[in-house]
Amino acid sequence: MALKAILFLGLFLVVIVSPITVYGGAVCPASSTFGRGSFPDGFLFGATTSAFQHEGAAEEGGRGSSIWDSFTLKQHSESNNNLDGRLGVDFYHHYKEDVQLLKKLNMDAFRFSISWSRIFPHGKKDKGVSETGVKFYNDLINELIANGVTPLVTLFQWDVPQALEDEYGGFLSDRILEDFRDFAQFAFNKYGDRVKHWVTINEPYEFSRGGYETGEKAPGRCSKYVNEKCVAGKSGHEVYTVSHNLLLAHAEAVEEFRKCGKCTGGKIGIVQSPMWFEPYDKKSTSSPSEEIVKRAMDFTLGWHMEPITHGDYPQAMKDVVGSRLPSFTPEQKEKLKGSYDFVGINYFTSTFVAHTDNVNPEKPSWEADSRLQLHSNNVDGFKIGSQPATAKYPVCADGLRKVLKYIKENYNDPEIIVTGNGYKETLEEKDVLPDALSDSNRKYYHMRHLMALHGAVCEDKVNVKGYFVSSLMDGLEWEDGYKTRSGLYYVDYGHNMGRHEKQSAKWLSKLLEKVPDTIQSKVDSDSRKEL
């Protein structure tokens, strides 16, 4: 274990300390060292938060409850854990100082989500609008723009108003399409004159699987044979219904966006959450490795990319899932096709994948349908990537490059924004502040992924326009609670939610420094001499 740690640290030092000369091409400029100047002009660098994870102020300004309020309260009361997500990190009251953190990081952009129930407390416009909630996002957007930071706004990041969940089951019902469309239209009309980058749905794969297949996320529905904690749900069925309605809701919002006069010049997209898959056994003769990887991509990324690009689900899913997979009408297919200006990608890690026939047809599930088995090691014992002891998943930056290239080749070479990429680590209560701030592994993670991204943009010519760190600061990591941290800034939950700069933030701020044109011209000239 000690040797492994030394090797990991050694590799980290080589990557971080050694100067990296980057030679440009048709897409990217040459630069003497790796940094902001290595990427094309206008490339956006930003950081993220989300409403439920960070805002707090759950009962202020007339905000209504969401399914995540209910879910975390239930989990908190049953297990006495630290999962009361209503606390967030009080971004609601600290947003002005948090915008200054973005400036200190030399960030160009900030991605955040709107809490549906903070705007429409009962989920519906005709049941009342919270003007306090409307003002909060208005003030936040103005504060960002006044400080030279571009807002990228997500409409739905998993927090369905509890009122709609109670009324008709949220995304289990197509009744939500009209309510989501009204919410989207309202947001576009209020903020579209200043917000020019919009996301409809964040990670439909994660929301539908976690909430309606495994029960690990709100609203916690699944079959007992999947998760004993679930008290309601139907795995292998509801997951497909919810995904179907998410896609249709996305299309409704995009159609509304296209009509929005204030939104002229803006762009809208959806955020996907793909992993990359490597074959567990490349020498297997029973199941070709290419077919397994393609099936894995179809059941994850393709599930929600094929419909919005080509108008229907992947054939591999239709063949296996059959009647449990809802069908699109001809009109819905036309509305879905091409319903995005960019694709957002949240990427965190990769895995090995193998075919399995070990499924029970009497217990339907997405996992059984996919016939996929995931492994951290391949058949020869090699790991997919390095994984420090506290890390939530292996560091596999090359997977980001492969995912981006896959999207370019399979989905009409779209404009892409890496809307989330971050290192999550679980810290014990005994970990003190100085240890948490010394996050060298997070620096290593982001450097490796930025280098992989550079390869995708500059060598593979993937049309990537931006990179967002997930996240700006620590917050509620959904079902993992507050012990798992992913921020560039440490949040001291026990002392007034104080923000503390981690080493990764200092490093990234330096990396993203804007070089004056006169200095950059000399750098470019010197770089050409080296050639």
UniProtKB/Swiss-Prot annotation:
PROSITE patterns on file: GLYCOSYL_HYDROL_F1_2 (PS00653)
Family per record: Belongs to the glycosyl hydrolase 1 family.
GO cellular component, one term: endoplasmic reticulum
Keywords from the UniProt entry: Disulfide bond, Hydrolase, Signal
GO molecular function: hydrolase activity, hydrolyzing O-glycosyl compounds
Species in which this protein is naturally found: Arabidopsis thaliana
Signal sequence segment: 1-24
PANTHER family: GLYCOSYL HYDROLASE, INACTIVE BETA-GLUCOSIDASE 25-RELATED
Entries under InterPro entries matching the protein: Glyco_hydro_1, Glyco_hydro_1_N_CS, Glycoside_hydrolase_SF
Gene3D superfamilies: Glycosidases
GO terms classed as biological process: carbohydrate metabolic process
Residues given in the record as a beta-D-glucoside binding sites: 53, 202-203, 348, 477-478
Active site: 203 (proton donor)
SUPFAM superfamilies per record: (Trans)glycosidases (SSF51445)
Top-level taxon of the source organism: Eukaryota
Record-annotated disulphide pairs: 222-230
Name of this chain's protein: Probable inactive beta-glucosidase 25
Recorded name of the encoding gene: BGLU25
